[in-house]
């Protein structure tokens, strides 16, 4: 059965348009809106229930290697508007989301230049939806961290030992799959999925994290956001944020132990899966808080307080283990922060440029503790071959979360071999 037939068969309820409405069922993922032949080119097929917003498989697709991936439709955001529902509480960080297809400026594969993200009335296209200088109608992100699918392929599989970028003969390491047992194996094995794939970019992770923030702000109960907190003190995705497969803020969370040992958890093994997804629903991206330090491409920190982020002209698939920190792929700016473990606080609200627009959700506006962002860690550690890790940071517990951004995180460098290094792949449609 081809993708056209599957798309007609799966699900019976009408799906929300695109990214959906924050706080509501299905928000944060969606049905691929392009030509079904794009899915075929990517090796993807819709799962049963893919078009049904009530299904655990809503917006979920399966790759030929067994990977489960979530479709994240392109969206625009608006920050700090006085008419935003949460403005009285969240002020400058009150976040609104609209599907990008609602704006006449947006078109899949349309050429993009710096400044084109300004869609008017404060609405801004997220940087994650530009790849290789063109607008993209979505990205697909692995639902789970990558593990070995049994054929030495990195695949997103439920209840599995996520792959450690570790120089060890254990079955759950990239070394046993033919890699070097180093952080940069994450790049190699992610892009091996096909021409449209790469290691998840810092922009894609930012988009996913911002969706979680907007969903928490838009929710009024746990009906469609299982991790919702009406007191707004722990209103963010939970996960394996303690070093024993439990969550720092929610004692009801428990994971199965990774084969490495009880310090780590198997991906997709939570007893409360909705609570550990980015959108508080079973259809969402899992294990985005804690678990391990999850590698992303597209960021460098080569000198003090200077961060480089992926250029507009660069495609995510362009990154390899050999060019991973090349200056030709990154544009630098001064964050004003410098080395040390701090906190992530605030979303940058620019309409153009790397420092103020592209960095939104990647680099904070300040480094003070902020419960809106989970009191998550932000740390810089300048050296020539450093990369950005997400989710866990250097100390687990309160500072681990979906807004954790760490240039250190253990040994930190791409060439480092470390048991807390994991990853997931993402892809763009042709």
Predicted regions and their residues:
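Cytochrome P450 core scaffold surrounding the K-helix E-X-X-R motif
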Residues: 80-83, 297-310
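Enriched but not universal
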Residues: 1-29, 424-430
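Acidic glycine-/aspartate-rich tracts in secreted/extracellular proteins
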Residues: 75-78, 145-148, 298-300, 428-430
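Short secondary-structure boundary/capping segments
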Residues: 212-219, 300, 309-312
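Short aromatic-cysteine micro-motif
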Residues: 55-58, 63-66, 91-288
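C-terminal, surface-exposed recognition/capping segments
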Residues: 203-206, 234-260, 272-275, 279, ...
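Short, solvent-exposed loop/turn elements at domain surfaces
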Residues: 78-86, 148-153
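Charged, compositionally biased non-catalytic regions
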Residues: 18-67
């Amino acid at each position: 059965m081809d993708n056209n037939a599957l798309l007609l068969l799966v699900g019976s309820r009408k799906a929300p348009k695109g990214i959906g409405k924050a706080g509501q069922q299905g928000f944060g993922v969606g049905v691929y809106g392009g030509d079904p032949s794009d899915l075929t080119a990517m090796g993807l097929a819709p799962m049963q229930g893919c078009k049904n917003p009530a299904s655990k498989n809503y917006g979920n697709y399966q790759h030929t290697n067994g990977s489960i991936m979530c479709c994240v439709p392109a969206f625009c955001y608006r920050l700090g508007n006085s008419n935003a529902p949460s403005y009285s509480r969240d002020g400058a960080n009150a976040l609104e989301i609209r599907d990008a297809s609602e704006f006449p400026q947006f078109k899949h594969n349309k050429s993009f230049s710096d400044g084109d993200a300004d869609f008017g009335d404060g609405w801004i296209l997220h940087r994650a939806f530009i790849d290789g200088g063109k607008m993209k109608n979505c990205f697909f992100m692995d639902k789970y961290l990558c593990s070995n699918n049994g054929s030495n392929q990195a695949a997103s599989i439920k209840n599995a030992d996520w792959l450690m970028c570790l120089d060890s003969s254990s079955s759950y390491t990239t070394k046993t799959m033919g890699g070097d047992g180093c952080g940069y194996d994450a790049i190699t094995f992610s892009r091996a999925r096909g021409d449209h794939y790469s290691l998840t970019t810092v922009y894609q992770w930012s988009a996913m994290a911002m969706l979680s923030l907007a969903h928490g702000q838009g929710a009024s109960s746990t009906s469609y956001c299982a991790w919702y907190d009406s007191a707004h003190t722990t209103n963010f995705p939970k996960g394996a944020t303690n070093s024993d497969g439990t969550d720092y803020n929610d004692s009801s969370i428990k994971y199965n132990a990774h084969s490495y040992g009880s310090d780590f958890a198997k991906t997709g093994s939570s007893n409360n899966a909705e609570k550990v997804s980015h959108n508080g629903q079973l259809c969402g991206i899992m294990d985005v808080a804690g678990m391990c330090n999850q590698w992303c491409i597209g960021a460098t920190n080569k000198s003090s307080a200077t961060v480089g982020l992926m250029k507009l002209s660069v495609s995510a698939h362009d990154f390899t283990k050999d060019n991973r920190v090349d200056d030709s792929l990154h544009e630098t700016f001064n964050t004003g922060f410098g080395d040390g473990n701090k906190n992530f606080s605030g979303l940058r609200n620019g309409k153009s440029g790397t420092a103020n627009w592209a960095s939104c959700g990647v680099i904070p506006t300040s480094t003070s503790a902020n419960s809106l962002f989970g009191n998550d860690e932000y740390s810089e550690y300048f050296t020539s071959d450093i990369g950005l890790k997400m989710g866990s940071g250097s100390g687990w517990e309160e500072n681990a979360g979906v807004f954790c951004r760490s240039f250190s995180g253990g040994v930190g460098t791409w060439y480092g071999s470390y048991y807390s290094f994991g990853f997931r792949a993402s892809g763009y449609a042709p």
